[in-house]
Amino acid sequence: MNREMLYLNRSDIEQAGGNHSQVYVDALTEALTAHAHNDFVQPLKPYLRQDPENGHIADRIIAMPSHIGGEHAISGIKWIGSKHDNPSKRNMERASGVIILNDPETNYPIAVMEASLISSMRTAAVSVIAAKHLAKKGFKDLTIIGCGLIGDKQLQSMLEQFDHIERVFVYDQFSEACARFVDRWQQQRPEINFIATENAKEAVSNGEVVITCTVTDQPYIEYDWLQKGAFISNISIMDVHKEVFIKADKVVVDDWSQCNREKKTINQLVLEGKFSKEALHAELGQLVTGDIPGREDDDEIILLNPMGMAIEDISSAYFIYQQAQQQNIGTTLNLY
């Protein structure tokens, strides 16, 4: 008896539609709804670090298993590695990985897929979905901090989903990377004004929507940098000072248990008695289902602190897997 599974490399995923934001928005809307309805299984993700005490926060391999129920039930795991100096030292993308999908009926593997494109695009979809609920309607000014793959896909997805963006403020600690990023995007979208800023404060203070896409292990964004009505999607987790959590009008997370883990900023604040689950406005899925309202005032400063959830990766991968099957894309592998 033979069993087959589908292998999809990055080119296959792109060919199946995985380089555009809508499939991820659709997949995450379903995954976040399942999260809000508690129709999922998602163990806390373990971090494999070669130097747990002294290593860089972005140097790790993470295992992210999950099962999602509902109409498109699927199980799987993302295994994703990261080295913060891959781009600067090795001219490689910071992160790389694979996703394995399993048929929930048999638990047999049905697909192996390149993970870093899916991971970066689903992360961008988190910001897109959050912005639909938490950003000011018709916002025009977007800020991107960090010009790597994550920043690129965040910008791509925001521009695909919001046609009212007029200015994009960009900052990266490497000025040459920032200049290349701005020049490339200015050529692609000449109707939008892309502005390379001198420092992070200038970029943040100009953004109605601010998205962090760095590998920093130290906070640098101060509350007073944020303009009234700003929404900040703290994708890279470590960028904002604790005072932003305390002073923001609303704090939203993707999953409380993931965000309240040991050594995470929220956990530190909880242990210090400065934050609690009761102080949390909502989990993102509760906004998607309408159980809790998003933005209620144009002057609110709102912080999203998403740790990233396996259900987002597995749901996205399954949507792309289905599209690849329909289009006969990929390589069939024999399990035995």
Swiss-Prot record:
Belongs to the ornithine cyclodeaminase/mu-crystallin family. Keywords: NAD, Oxidoreductase. GO terms for biological process: siderophore biosynthetic process. Induction: Up-regulated under iron-deficient growth conditions. Repressed by Fur under iron-rich growth conditions. GO terms for cellular component: cytoplasm. The lineage of its organism: Bacteria, Bacillati, Bacillota, Bacilli, Bacillales. The keyword Oxidoreductase applies. Homodimer. It catalyses: N-[(2S)-2-amino-2-carboxyethyl]-L-glutamate + NAD(+) + H2O = (S)-2,3-diaminopropanoate + 2-oxoglutarate + NADH + H(+). Its EC number is 1.5.1.51. It comes from the Bacteria. The active site is at K78. The keyword Metal-binding does not apply. Disruption phenotype: Mutation results in abrogation of synthesis of staphyloferrin B. This is N-((2S)-2-amino-2-carboxyethyl)-L-glutamate dehydrogenase. Pathway: Siderophore biosynthesis. PANTHER family: KETIMINE REDUCTASE MU-CRYSTALLIN. InterPro entries: Ig-like_dom, NAD(P)-bd_dom_sf, ODC_Mu_crystall, ODC_N, SbnB. NAD(+) binds at R122, K242. It comes from Staphylococcus aureus (strain NCTC 8325 / PS 47). GO terms for molecular function: oxidoreductase activity, acting on the CH-NH2 group of donors, NAD or NADP as acceptor.
